[in-house]
Amino acid sequence: MNILRRGRLGNSIKEDVAKYTTSLSFDKEIFEADILCDIAHVIMLYEQGIIKKEDAKKIIEGLKEIYKKGMENLNLDPSLDDIHMVIESELIKKLGEDVAGRMHTGRSRNDEVATDLRIALREKVLIIAKSLIKMLKDILELAEKHKETLIVGYTHLQHAQPVTFAHHLLSYVSAIERDILRLLDAYKRINISPLGCGAMATTGFKINRERTKELLGFDALIENSMDGVSARDFILETMADLAILGTNLSKICEELILFSTYEFGTIEIANEFCSTSSIMPQKKNPDVAEIARAKLSKLNGNLVTALTILKALPNTYNRDLQEISPHLWDSVYTTIDTIKMVHGMLKTIKINKERMEELAKANYSTATELADTLVRETGIPFRTAHGIVGEVVRRSIEEKKDMIEVIYEVLEKYNLKVDEEKIKKALDPYENVKMRDVIGGPAPEEVEKRIKVFRERLDRYEKEVDEKLQKINKVKEILLSYEI
Protein backbone atom coordinates (compact mmCIF):
# COMPACT_ATOMS: atom_id res chain seq x y z
CA MET A 1 0.00 0.00 0.00
CA ASN A 2 1.28 3.44 -0.93
CA ILE A 3 0.83 5.46 2.27
CA LEU A 4 1.18 8.73 0.41
CA ARG A 5 -1.20 8.21 -2.53
CA ARG A 6 -3.98 6.17 -0.95
CA GLY A 7 -6.15 9.07 0.19
CA ARG A 8 -6.31 11.62 -2.61
CA LEU A 9 -5.06 9.56 -5.55
CA GLY A 10 -5.70 5.94 -4.71
CA ASN A 11 -2.97 3.32 -4.55
CA SER A 12 -2.35 2.80 -8.24
CA ILE A 13 0.46 4.45 -10.17
CA LYS A 14 1.73 3.38 -13.57
CA GLU A 15 5.10 1.68 -13.33
CA ASP A 16 6.69 3.83 -16.03
CA VAL A 17 5.45 7.01 -14.32
CA ALA A 18 6.88 5.86 -10.99
CA LYS A 19 10.25 5.09 -12.56
CA TYR A 20 10.26 8.41 -14.40
CA THR A 21 9.56 10.53 -11.32
CA THR A 22 11.41 8.71 -8.54
CA SER A 23 14.57 10.19 -7.02
CA LEU A 24 15.72 6.97 -5.36
CA SER A 25 18.68 6.48 -7.69
CA PHE A 26 20.41 9.53 -6.21
CA ASP A 27 18.72 9.68 -2.79
CA LYS A 28 21.50 7.45 -1.47
CA GLU A 29 23.40 10.71 -0.97
CA ILE A 30 20.87 11.89 1.62
CA PHE A 31 19.96 8.59 3.29
CA GLU A 32 22.07 9.22 6.40
CA ALA A 33 21.01 12.87 6.51
CA ASP A 34 17.35 11.85 6.36
CA ILE A 35 17.73 9.48 9.32
CA LEU A 36 19.46 12.22 11.33
CA CYS A 37 16.75 14.70 10.37
CA ASP A 38 14.02 12.24 11.40
CA ILE A 39 15.61 11.52 14.78
CA ALA A 40 16.13 15.21 15.56
CA HIS A 41 12.54 16.00 14.57
CA VAL A 42 11.14 13.19 16.75
CA ILE A 43 13.22 14.27 19.75
CA MET A 44 11.83 17.78 19.37
CA LEU A 45 8.24 16.53 18.98
CA TYR A 46 8.59 14.57 22.22
CA GLU A 47 10.21 17.45 24.11
CA GLN A 48 7.41 19.76 22.95
CA GLY A 49 4.77 17.32 24.17
CA ILE A 50 3.46 16.76 20.66
CA ILE A 51 4.01 12.98 20.71
CA LYS A 52 4.25 10.56 23.62
CA LYS A 53 7.52 9.35 25.11
CA GLU A 54 6.89 5.69 24.32
CA ASP A 55 6.06 6.50 20.68
CA ALA A 56 9.13 8.70 20.30
CA LYS A 57 11.32 5.99 21.80
CA LYS A 58 10.00 3.32 19.44
CA ILE A 59 10.35 5.59 16.40
CA ILE A 60 13.94 6.53 17.24
CA GLU A 61 14.94 2.91 17.83
CA GLY A 62 13.25 1.93 14.57
CA LEU A 63 15.14 4.64 12.69
CA LYS A 64 18.44 3.40 14.13
CA GLU A 65 17.62 -0.12 12.93
CA ILE A 66 16.83 1.18 9.44
CA TYR A 67 20.12 3.10 9.42
CA LYS A 68 22.08 -0.03 10.38
CA LYS A 69 20.21 -2.05 7.78
CA GLY A 70 21.34 0.35 5.07
CA MET A 71 19.42 1.88 2.21
CA GLU A 72 20.42 -0.91 -0.17
CA ASN A 73 18.48 -3.42 1.94
CA LEU A 74 15.23 -1.46 2.01
CA ASN A 75 12.26 -1.82 -0.32
CA LEU A 76 13.24 0.75 -2.96
CA ASP A 77 9.91 0.68 -4.76
CA PRO A 78 9.83 3.59 -7.26
CA SER A 79 6.14 4.11 -6.48
CA LEU A 80 7.20 5.41 -3.05
CA ASP A 81 8.79 8.40 -4.80
CA ASP A 82 11.81 9.00 -2.61
CA ILE A 83 13.92 7.99 0.37
CA HIS A 84 11.69 9.89 2.81
CA MET A 85 8.70 7.71 2.01
CA VAL A 86 10.82 4.54 1.83
CA ILE A 87 12.01 5.15 5.39
CA GLU A 88 8.55 6.05 6.67
CA SER A 89 7.02 2.99 4.97
CA GLU A 90 9.69 0.76 6.49
CA LEU A 91 9.01 2.27 9.90
CA ILE A 92 5.26 1.73 9.56
CA LYS A 93 5.88 -1.92 8.65
CA LYS A 94 7.93 -2.28 11.84
CA LEU A 95 5.84 -0.27 14.30
CA GLY A 96 2.43 0.18 12.74
CA GLU A 97 0.93 3.43 11.57
CA ASP A 98 -0.42 4.37 15.00
CA VAL A 99 3.18 4.84 16.17
CA ALA A 100 5.32 5.42 13.07
CA GLY A 101 2.66 7.56 11.43
CA ARG A 102 3.32 10.23 14.07
CA MET A 103 6.91 10.86 12.91
CA HIS A 104 5.91 13.26 10.15
CA THR A 105 3.79 15.45 12.44
CA GLY A 106 4.46 19.15 11.87
CA ARG A 107 6.74 18.52 8.93
CA SER A 108 6.67 18.25 5.13
CA ARG A 109 8.95 16.49 2.72
CA ASN A 110 9.63 19.99 1.41
CA ASP A 111 11.47 21.20 4.51
CA GLU A 112 12.79 17.68 5.12
CA VAL A 113 14.61 17.34 1.80
CA ALA A 114 15.91 20.91 2.01
CA THR A 115 17.39 20.02 5.40
CA ASP A 116 18.81 16.71 4.18
CA LEU A 117 20.58 18.35 1.26
CA ARG A 118 22.25 20.87 3.54
CA ILE A 119 23.34 18.18 6.01
CA ALA A 120 24.84 16.04 3.25
CA LEU A 121 26.42 18.88 1.31
CA ARG A 122 28.08 20.65 4.23
CA GLU A 123 30.19 17.57 4.96
CA LYS A 124 31.19 17.12 1.32
CA VAL A 125 32.26 20.77 1.09
CA LEU A 126 34.51 20.31 4.11
CA ILE A 127 35.95 17.07 2.70
CA ILE A 128 36.81 18.88 -0.53
CA ALA A 129 38.37 21.80 1.35
CA LYS A 130 40.45 19.43 3.47
CA SER A 131 41.72 17.53 0.44
CA LEU A 132 42.72 20.81 -1.20
CA ILE A 133 44.58 21.89 1.93
CA LYS A 134 46.52 18.62 1.94
CA MET A 135 47.37 19.02 -1.74
CA LEU A 136 48.58 22.60 -1.27
CA LYS A 137 50.75 21.59 1.67
CA ASP A 138 52.47 19.01 -0.54
CA ILE A 139 52.89 21.60 -3.31
CA LEU A 140 54.59 23.87 -0.77
CA GLU A 141 56.94 21.01 0.13
CA LEU A 142 57.84 20.69 -3.55
CA ALA A 143 58.27 24.45 -3.89
CA GLU A 144 60.64 24.48 -0.92
CA LYS A 145 63.02 22.27 -2.91
CA HIS A 146 62.95 24.47 -6.01
CA LYS A 147 63.29 28.06 -4.80
CA GLU A 148 66.38 28.47 -7.00
CA THR A 149 65.38 26.20 -9.89
CA LEU A 150 65.19 28.51 -12.90
CA ILE A 151 62.35 28.22 -15.39
CA VAL A 152 60.99 30.53 -18.02
CA GLY A 153 57.60 32.11 -17.43
CA TYR A 154 55.21 32.37 -20.35
CA THR A 155 52.64 34.82 -21.60
CA HIS A 156 50.65 33.86 -24.72
CA LEU A 157 52.66 30.61 -24.36
CA GLN A 158 55.72 32.56 -25.55
CA HIS A 159 58.87 33.11 -23.50
CA ALA A 160 58.28 36.04 -21.17
CA GLN A 161 60.57 36.36 -18.14
CA PRO A 162 62.67 34.03 -16.00
CA VAL A 163 61.15 32.90 -12.71
CA THR A 164 61.64 29.80 -10.54
CA PHE A 165 59.78 26.53 -10.44
CA ALA A 166 58.84 27.32 -6.84
CA HIS A 167 57.30 30.61 -7.93
CA HIS A 168 55.30 28.79 -10.60
CA LEU A 169 54.07 26.26 -8.05
CA LEU A 170 53.03 29.06 -5.70
CA SER A 171 50.77 30.40 -8.45
CA TYR A 172 48.78 27.16 -8.05
CA VAL A 173 48.71 27.58 -4.28
CA SER A 174 47.58 31.20 -4.55
CA ALA A 175 44.70 30.35 -6.89
CA ILE A 176 43.48 27.26 -5.06
CA GLU A 177 43.68 29.02 -1.70
CA ARG A 178 40.85 31.23 -3.00
CA ASP A 179 38.91 28.08 -3.90
CA ILE A 180 39.26 26.92 -0.29
CA LEU A 181 38.07 30.30 0.97
CA ARG A 182 35.08 30.23 -1.38
CA LEU A 183 34.06 26.80 -0.10
CA LEU A 184 34.44 27.83 3.54
CA ASP A 185 32.40 30.93 2.84
CA ALA A 186 29.71 28.88 1.09
CA TYR A 187 29.57 26.64 4.17
CA LYS A 188 28.11 29.58 6.12
CA ARG A 189 25.11 29.66 3.79
CA ILE A 190 24.81 25.88 3.53
CA ASN A 191 24.73 25.30 7.28
CA ILE A 192 21.39 27.06 7.88
CA SER A 193 18.35 25.05 8.93
CA PRO A 194 15.06 25.11 6.99
CA LEU A 195 13.57 22.37 9.19
CA GLY A 196 10.22 23.49 10.54
CA CYS A 197 9.29 25.51 7.46
CA GLY A 198 6.78 22.77 6.59
CA ALA A 199 5.34 22.62 3.10
CA MET A 200 5.78 26.40 2.81
CA ALA A 201 3.87 27.99 5.73
CA THR A 202 5.37 26.28 8.82
CA THR A 203 2.84 24.43 11.02
CA GLY A 204 0.17 24.99 13.66
CA PHE A 205 1.97 22.60 16.00
CA LYS A 206 4.14 24.34 18.59
CA ILE A 207 7.42 23.02 17.29
CA ASN A 208 10.83 24.28 18.39
CA ARG A 209 12.97 25.11 15.37
CA GLU A 210 15.85 26.28 17.55
CA ARG A 211 16.01 22.83 19.13
CA THR A 212 16.25 20.94 15.83
CA LYS A 213 18.81 23.47 14.64
CA GLU A 214 20.91 22.68 17.70
CA LEU A 215 20.44 18.90 17.44
CA LEU A 216 21.50 18.87 13.78
CA GLY A 217 24.49 21.18 14.25
CA PHE A 218 23.23 24.07 12.15
CA ASP A 219 24.56 27.56 12.82
CA ALA A 220 21.35 29.48 12.08
CA LEU A 221 17.74 29.26 10.89
CA ILE A 222 16.20 30.30 7.60
CA GLU A 223 13.73 32.89 8.83
CA ASN A 224 11.11 32.73 6.09
CA SER A 225 9.28 29.47 5.51
CA MET A 226 8.62 30.06 1.81
CA ASP A 227 12.28 30.73 1.19
CA GLY A 228 13.24 27.81 3.41
CA VAL A 229 11.63 25.18 1.20
CA SER A 230 12.49 26.74 -2.15
CA ALA A 231 16.04 28.00 -1.60
CA ARG A 232 18.62 26.14 -3.66
CA ASP A 233 21.04 29.03 -4.03
CA PHE A 234 23.36 27.26 -1.60
CA ILE A 235 23.60 24.48 -4.19
CA LEU A 236 24.22 26.94 -7.01
CA GLU A 237 26.90 28.66 -4.97
CA THR A 238 28.63 25.37 -4.22
CA MET A 239 28.43 24.25 -7.84
CA ALA A 240 29.81 27.61 -8.99
CA ASP A 241 32.66 27.29 -6.51
CA LEU A 242 33.40 23.80 -7.79
CA ALA A 243 33.29 24.99 -11.41
CA ILE A 244 35.84 27.70 -10.60
CA LEU A 245 37.97 25.16 -8.76
CA GLY A 246 37.64 22.85 -11.75
CA THR A 247 38.96 25.59 -14.02
CA ASN A 248 42.03 25.97 -11.80
CA LEU A 249 42.60 22.21 -11.64
CA SER A 250 42.14 21.95 -15.40
CA LYS A 251 44.83 24.60 -15.90
CA ILE A 252 47.23 22.49 -13.82
CA CYS A 253 46.36 19.40 -15.88
CA GLU A 254 46.96 21.32 -19.09
CA GLU A 255 50.40 22.44 -17.91
CA LEU A 256 51.32 18.92 -16.79
CA ILE A 257 50.41 17.69 -20.27
CA LEU A 258 52.22 20.53 -22.02
CA PHE A 259 55.42 20.59 -19.97
CA SER A 260 55.80 16.80 -20.16
CA THR A 261 55.97 16.86 -23.97
CA TYR A 262 59.29 16.29 -25.73
CA GLU A 263 59.23 19.88 -26.98
CA PHE A 264 59.13 21.30 -23.44
CA GLY A 265 60.60 18.38 -21.53
CA THR A 266 60.71 20.14 -18.17
CA ILE A 267 58.76 17.53 -16.21
CA GLU A 268 57.85 13.86 -16.41
CA ILE A 269 54.55 12.49 -15.12
CA ALA A 270 54.87 9.28 -13.11
CA ASN A 271 54.12 6.05 -15.00
CA GLU A 272 51.09 5.21 -12.85
CA PHE A 273 49.29 8.26 -14.24
CA CYS A 274 50.09 7.47 -17.88
CA SER A 275 49.23 4.91 -20.54
CA THR A 276 50.87 3.71 -23.72
CA SER A 277 49.69 3.19 -27.27
CA SER A 278 48.19 0.00 -28.66
CA ILE A 279 50.34 0.39 -31.78
CA MET A 280 53.22 2.77 -30.95
CA PRO A 281 55.45 1.05 -28.38
CA GLN A 282 57.43 4.19 -27.50
CA LYS A 283 54.43 6.19 -26.31
CA LYS A 284 53.88 7.49 -22.78
CA ASN A 285 50.57 9.31 -22.83
CA PRO A 286 49.35 11.60 -20.00
CA ASP A 287 45.91 9.96 -19.92
CA VAL A 288 44.97 10.81 -16.34
CA ALA A 289 45.63 14.52 -16.86
CA GLU A 290 43.68 14.43 -20.13
CA ILE A 291 40.71 12.61 -18.61
CA ALA A 292 40.74 14.98 -15.63
CA ARG A 293 40.75 17.94 -17.99
CA ALA A 294 37.67 16.51 -19.72
CA LYS A 295 35.82 15.45 -16.57
CA LEU A 296 36.23 18.91 -15.05
CA SER A 297 34.30 20.35 -17.99
CA LYS A 298 31.20 18.67 -16.56
CA LEU A 299 31.30 21.02 -13.59
CA ASN A 300 30.45 23.92 -15.89
CA GLY A 301 27.67 21.95 -17.57
CA ASN A 302 26.19 20.84 -14.26
CA LEU A 303 26.12 24.41 -13.00
CA VAL A 304 24.39 25.69 -16.12
CA THR A 305 21.84 22.86 -15.90
CA ALA A 306 21.04 23.73 -12.28
CA LEU A 307 20.75 27.43 -13.09
CA THR A 308 18.44 26.64 -15.99
CA ILE A 309 16.19 24.41 -13.86
CA LEU A 310 15.82 27.17 -11.29
CA LYS A 311 15.59 30.24 -13.50
CA ALA A 312 11.82 30.37 -14.04
CA LEU A 313 10.31 28.44 -11.14
CA PRO A 314 7.53 30.03 -9.12
CA ASN A 315 8.22 30.57 -5.43
CA THR A 316 8.33 27.76 -2.82
CA TYR A 317 8.64 24.06 -3.64
CA ASN A 318 8.36 22.61 -7.13
CA ARG A 319 9.23 19.03 -8.06
CA ASP A 320 11.68 20.39 -10.65
CA LEU A 321 14.08 20.98 -7.75
CA GLN A 322 14.59 17.23 -7.47
CA GLU A 323 16.40 17.18 -10.81
CA ILE A 324 19.20 19.43 -9.55
CA SER A 325 20.46 16.78 -7.15
CA PRO A 326 22.14 14.35 -9.58
CA HIS A 327 24.06 17.24 -11.13
CA LEU A 328 25.14 18.47 -7.71
CA TRP A 329 26.45 15.08 -6.64
CA ASP A 330 28.14 14.50 -9.98
CA SER A 331 30.01 17.78 -9.49
CA VAL A 332 30.91 16.87 -5.92
CA TYR A 333 32.31 13.42 -6.72
CA THR A 334 34.03 14.52 -9.92
CA THR A 335 35.79 17.17 -7.86
CA ILE A 336 36.77 14.79 -5.05
CA ASP A 337 38.13 12.20 -7.50
CA THR A 338 39.99 14.74 -9.63
CA ILE A 339 41.69 16.40 -6.66
CA LYS A 340 43.06 12.99 -5.74
CA MET A 341 44.44 12.52 -9.27
CA VAL A 342 45.97 16.00 -9.57
CA HIS A 343 47.48 15.71 -6.09
CA GLY A 344 49.01 12.37 -7.00
CA MET A 345 50.49 13.66 -10.25
CA LEU A 346 52.02 16.73 -8.63
CA LYS A 347 53.43 14.73 -5.74
CA THR A 348 55.24 12.30 -8.03
CA ILE A 349 56.45 14.41 -10.98
CA LYS A 350 60.10 14.29 -11.97
CA ILE A 351 61.80 17.63 -12.56
CA ASN A 352 64.34 18.21 -15.35
CA LYS A 353 66.32 21.13 -13.89
CA GLU A 354 68.77 21.27 -16.78
CA ARG A 355 66.01 21.63 -19.36
CA MET A 356 64.25 24.23 -17.21
CA GLU A 357 67.43 26.31 -16.98
CA GLU A 358 68.11 25.90 -20.69
CA LEU A 359 64.70 27.35 -21.54
CA ALA A 360 65.07 30.14 -18.96
CA LYS A 361 68.26 31.32 -20.66
CA ALA A 362 66.86 31.15 -24.18
CA ASN A 363 64.82 33.37 -26.47
CA TYR A 364 65.48 36.79 -24.90
CA SER A 365 63.59 36.18 -21.65
CA THR A 366 65.82 38.77 -19.90
CA ALA A 367 64.92 41.60 -22.28
CA THR A 368 62.60 43.29 -19.76
CA GLU A 369 65.35 43.58 -17.16
CA LEU A 370 67.69 44.97 -19.80
CA ALA A 371 65.16 47.73 -20.54
CA ASP A 372 64.74 48.37 -16.80
CA THR A 373 68.52 48.63 -16.43
CA LEU A 374 68.71 51.26 -19.18
CA VAL A 375 66.07 53.28 -17.32
CA ARG A 376 67.92 53.03 -14.01
CA GLU A 377 71.38 53.70 -15.44
CA THR A 378 70.66 56.40 -18.03
CA GLY A 379 67.44 58.03 -16.87
CA ILE A 380 65.66 57.59 -20.20
CA PRO A 381 61.89 56.93 -20.20
CA PHE A 382 60.87 53.28 -20.03
CA ARG A 383 59.07 53.51 -23.38
CA THR A 384 62.30 54.71 -25.00
CA ALA A 385 64.24 51.88 -23.34
CA HIS A 386 61.57 49.43 -24.50
CA GLY A 387 62.11 50.52 -28.10
CA ILE A 388 65.90 50.31 -27.83
CA VAL A 389 65.84 46.78 -26.41
CA GLY A 390 63.27 45.76 -29.00
CA GLU A 391 65.74 46.90 -31.65
CA VAL A 392 68.49 44.88 -29.94
CA VAL A 393 66.31 41.75 -30.03
CA ARG A 394 65.34 42.31 -33.68
CA ARG A 395 68.95 42.76 -34.76
CA SER A 396 70.05 39.75 -32.71
CA ILE A 397 67.51 37.60 -34.54
CA GLU A 398 68.31 39.02 -37.97
CA GLU A 399 72.08 38.82 -37.48
CA LYS A 400 71.95 35.51 -35.57
CA LYS A 401 73.90 36.98 -32.67
CA ASP A 402 73.51 37.04 -28.90
CA MET A 403 72.11 40.21 -27.34
CA ILE A 404 75.44 40.94 -25.66
CA GLU A 405 77.05 41.17 -29.11
CA VAL A 406 74.54 43.74 -30.35
CA ILE A 407 73.66 45.86 -27.32
CA TYR A 408 76.75 48.10 -27.32
CA GLU A 409 76.36 49.05 -30.98
CA VAL A 410 72.75 50.02 -30.40
CA LEU A 411 73.60 51.97 -27.22
CA GLU A 412 76.30 53.86 -29.09
CA LYS A 413 73.77 54.74 -31.78
CA TYR A 414 71.64 56.44 -29.10
CA ASN A 415 74.66 57.99 -27.31
CA LEU A 416 74.06 55.90 -24.20
CA LYS A 417 76.66 54.29 -21.95
CA VAL A 418 76.04 51.55 -19.40
CA ASP A 419 78.65 49.67 -17.37
CA GLU A 420 79.42 46.26 -18.88
CA GLU A 421 78.84 44.47 -15.57
CA LYS A 422 75.39 46.04 -15.32
CA ILE A 423 74.56 44.77 -18.81
CA LYS A 424 75.78 41.26 -18.01
CA LYS A 425 73.78 41.24 -14.80
CA ALA A 426 70.66 42.36 -16.65
CA LEU A 427 71.07 39.50 -19.12
CA ASP A 428 71.63 36.86 -16.42
CA PRO A 429 68.32 35.05 -15.74
CA TYR A 430 69.21 34.18 -12.15
CA GLU A 431 70.11 37.80 -11.40
CA ASN A 432 66.77 38.76 -12.96
CA VAL A 433 64.99 36.52 -10.49
CA LYS A 434 66.99 37.73 -7.48
CA MET A 435 66.14 41.37 -8.24
CA ARG A 436 62.41 40.70 -8.22
CA ASP A 437 62.02 40.61 -4.47
CA VAL A 438 58.83 42.62 -4.10
CA ILE A 439 55.87 40.94 -2.38
CA GLY A 440 54.70 38.13 -4.63
CA GLY A 441 57.89 38.15 -6.71
CA PRO A 442 60.06 35.17 -7.74
CA ALA A 443 63.20 36.03 -5.73
CA PRO A 444 64.13 33.01 -3.57
CA GLU A 445 63.99 35.01 -0.33
CA GLU A 446 60.54 36.35 -1.20
CA VAL A 447 59.32 32.90 -2.25
CA GLU A 448 60.51 31.54 1.11
CA LYS A 449 58.46 34.22 2.88
CA ARG A 450 55.36 33.37 0.81
CA ILE A 451 55.79 29.66 1.54
CA LYS A 452 55.81 30.44 5.26
CA VAL A 453 52.75 32.70 4.99
CA PHE A 454 50.83 30.16 2.90
CA ARG A 455 51.66 27.40 5.39
CA GLU A 456 50.41 29.48 8.30
CA ARG A 457 47.15 30.25 6.53
CA LEU A 458 46.63 26.65 5.44
CA ASP A 459 47.12 25.54 9.05
CA ARG A 460 44.36 27.97 10.08
CA TYR A 461 42.01 26.71 7.38
CA GLU A 462 42.74 23.11 8.33
CA LYS A 463 41.96 23.83 11.97
CA GLU A 464 38.67 25.46 10.98
CA VAL A 465 37.72 22.53 8.74
CA ASP A 466 38.64 19.96 11.39
CA GLU A 467 36.57 21.76 14.02
CA LYS A 468 33.55 21.81 11.72
CA LEU A 469 33.97 18.13 10.83
CA GLN A 470 34.29 17.24 14.51
CA LYS A 471 31.05 19.08 15.22
CA ILE A 472 29.29 17.22 12.41
CA ASN A 473 30.61 13.86 13.60
CA LYS A 474 29.50 14.68 17.14
CA VAL A 475 25.99 15.38 15.85
CA LYS A 476 25.92 11.97 14.17
CA GLU A 477 27.27 10.25 17.26
CA ILE A 478 24.71 11.86 19.57
CA LEU A 479 21.68 11.33 17.33
CA LEU A 480 22.52 7.77 16.30
CA SER A 481 22.97 6.75 19.94
CA TYR A 482 20.16 8.90 21.38
CA GLU A 483 17.88 7.28 23.91
CA ILE A 484 14.76 8.74 25.45
Curated annotation (Swiss-Prot):
Predominant cellular place of this UniProt entry's protein: cytoplasm
Domain of life: Archaea
A GO-annotated cellular component: cytosol
Catalytic activity: 2-(N(omega)-L-arginino)succinate = fumarate + L-arginine
Places the protein is found: Cytoplasm
GO MF, any single term: argininosuccinate lyase activity
Keyword set, alphabetical order: Amino-acid biosynthesis, Arginine biosynthesis, Cytoplasm, Lyase
EC number(s) recorded for this UniProt protein: 4.3.2.1
Matches recorded under Pfam families: ASL_C2 (PF14698), Lyase_1 (PF00206)
Class of the enzyme per the UniProt entry, highest EC level: lyase
Pathway assigned to this chain's UniProt record: Amino-acid biosynthesis; L-arginine biosynthesis; L-arginine from L-ornithine and carbamoyl phosphate: step 3/3
Biological process (GO), any one: L-arginine biosynthetic process
Protein family membership: Belongs to the lyase 1 family. Argininosuccinate lyase subfamily.
Protein name: Argininosuccinate lyase
Gene: argH
